[in-house]
Amino acid sequence: MTMKFELDKTSGRARRGRMVFERGTVETPAFMPVGTLGTVKGMTPEEVKDTGAQICLGNTFHLMLRPGTQIIQQHGDLHDFMNWDKPILTDSGGFQVFSLGELRKITEEGVTFRSPINGEKILLTPEKSMQVQRELGSDIVMIFDECTPFPATQAEARSSMELSLRWAERSKQEHGESKAALFGIIQGGMYEELRDISLKGLTDIGFDGYAIGGLSVGEPKEDMMRILEHTAPQMPEQKPRYLMGVGKPEDLVEAVRRGIDMFDCVMPTRNARNGHLFISTGVVKIRNAVHRTDTSPLDENCDCYTCKNYSRAYLHHLDRTNEMLGSRLNTIHNLRFYQKVMSDMRDALDAGTFDDYVKEFYRLRDQSVPALD
């Protein structure tokens, strides 16, 4: 079966729904932990599930280069390879190619680059990206696009967006009769009119879901919110809406307020490894000396394995001594915190108390609720 999206209820622009796959149901709004190389760094699949994750993200670009789809297919597909029995979304490789900067060359055909592993010259095209994602057995496949850099002139952003639209058409053609869901990615830089053209082009082609790409690439927060505010309400109502690569807990709340259903970001896992831990009142920098003698848990309100079993002083000690257990315990906590933010939003939407949830979320942080335009 292909993915089925059900929209249950709304509160303002915030949406409560679910995506139904053969491998399970994903209640939305949802956060997807990033498992770039077939692993959420330092975590077993069971531990990731225990945080509340319903779906995870894999990286086409990296998995194509190493270990390669041939080895993955010897196990079945990516689910079997990494022992994850829930849905997987794979990104197309477009963003990673964008990250290579000067090491890549973009043409109408695709992107040519040197493998960061062995220097081999590789051509990644929309067709190749679809083929690799099919071999990975992805449940949600992302089209191959060019992530518009920031800053970009309107002419540069237009040219990039138009190329992405042509690649979207080719991605859809190559995807063919595959049972996996195929999502289009809206580009257009920081220009509303280009975002509109991109969205219209993608909806004319027709996809199972739509993502906002090209944000969280170094632009000021105001620009991100401006584009999100403009674009999200125009996205098809009966299809999932995905904001790629975002963000902090506050960003998730603000994006849900504006109608987004899905998120992914490395922030909870990467910040965990750097000792930056999210709690209901803000961020704890566990490396700081103030935690050296603190016997209290990281977050009194958290039900994660870390908070139930260890003190701030112990986590501080692990961080200071560079013990790998520290990164693991921190990651368990941060991922659970993110999943709890999402499940609390879902519960509030179910109960019709979403506005109250938002007020309490910001009250705990000593912040006022940002205005919706």
Curated annotation (Swiss-Prot):
Q: What is the catalytic activity of this protein?
A: 7-aminomethyl-7-carbaguanine + guanosine(34) in tRNA = 7-aminomethyl-7-carbaguanosine(34) in tRNA + guanine
- Any note on cofactor binding? Binds 1 zinc ion per subunit.
What EC number(s) does the entry state?
2.4.2.29
Cofactor(s) needed by this chain: Zn(2+)
Q: Name one GO molecular function term.
A: tRNA-guanosine(34) queuine transglycosylase activity
Sequence segments annotated as region (RNA binding): 245-251, 269-273
Biological processes annotated in GO: queuosine biosynthetic process; tRNA wobble guanine modification; tRNA-guanine transglycosylation
Q: What family name appears in the similarity comment?
A: Belongs to the queuine tRNA-ribosyltransferase family.
Q: Subunit notes for this chain?
A: Homodimer. Within each dimer, one monomer is responsible for RNA recognition and catalysis, while the other monomer binds to the replacement base PreQ1.
Q: Which PANTHER family match?
A: QUEUINE TRNA-RIBOSYLTRANSFERASE (PTHR46499:SF1)
Name this protein carries in UniProt = Queuine tRNA-ribosyltransferase
